[in-house]
Structure formats: structure tokens, C-alpha cells
Amino acid sequence: MPTHAEKRVVPYRPEQLFDLVADVAKYPQFLPWCVGARIRSQTEKELIADLTIGFGPFRESFTSRVTLERPHRVKVRYEKGPFRYLNNEWDFEPHPTGCCVDFFVDFEFRSRILQRAIGVVFNEAVRRMVNAFLKRARDVYGPPPATVSVVPAPARARP
């Protein structure tokens, strides 16, 4: 049951980061291991998406229901695929130097083989994923001012 929570202050507005995370269709363009994305349905408040993740010899697709609470929260709930469960949440709060991002992911694969494989690289994979979103923000919105940096902050506890 890999779980990861982290909080960072980043030099972008909550709306900007929300828009990047909510744009699931573009994940294959920048997110490591995301090799496909298809939006099944979308409204202003919710979307249903199929994502295909590939790492090493493994390739798995899954369906998620994504709740959009612009500009403060993106919640991902697993619907169908190789997981027993998957919960992912991004919270965006205004901060004097930009935005405080609170990120949480918790999941378990049905397959013990997949669970063991991801367990070995889980922390590195999550770090790369979060950094990919930060790089995407720089690519889309430009570099932050030289006086501002990404600052880790303590993540809040999740149930």
C-alpha cells in the first residue's frame, strides 16, 4: 500500500496549477510513465478518464473519476483497472509567494507482482511525477522570478 503525501510552496497561482493537474488529456506529453490518456466524459465539475501507465515491461490501463473544485482541489477516485484502490488528491491554496500545493496518493495493485515492482521505485516515481508537474508549469507559464524557489512544507495527515 504505497502512500505519499507532500506539501510544497511553488511560485505559481492556484488557478495555474489547478489547470495543469485538471488537464488529464495532456498527461502523456509530460508525465513520466503516462503513455496514454482518453477523456470519456467531462463537465465543469467532473471528468472520467482512462489512463495507460507503462513502466519497464508493465503496461496497465485504468479508469478514474476526477472531481474538479476549481481552483482549490482535484480529487481522483479509482473506478476500474488493476488496482484494489487508488486515491489521489491535489489541494491548492494561495500563499504570499504563489501557491501551497498539498499532494496525496495512496493505492494498492491487485497483482502482487505489480505491487512489488512499484514498491521498489515508488518514492522515486512520485518524486518524478511531482517534479514533472512543476516543470510543466515552467514550460507553460514561464520561469518563476529568480527570488522565488520551491519550498517543501510539512504535508497534512490524511485519513
Language model: regions and residue ranges:
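Glycine-rich portal/gate segments that line the openings of hydrophobic small-molecule binding cavities
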Residues: 38-80, 132, 136-139, 144, ...
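Beta-strand/loop substructures that line and gate deep hydrophobic ligand-binding cavities in soluble
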Residues: 78-128
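Hydrophobic ligand-binding cavity/cleft-lining segments
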Residues: 1-44, 97, 143, 151-159
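Intrinsic-disorder/low-complexity, polar/charged segments enriched in Ser/Thr/Lys/Arg/Asp/Glu/Gln
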Residues: 3-7, 46-48, 61-63, 73, ...
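A short, structured loop/turn motif at beta-sheet edges
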Residues: 14, 41-45, 67-71, 91-100
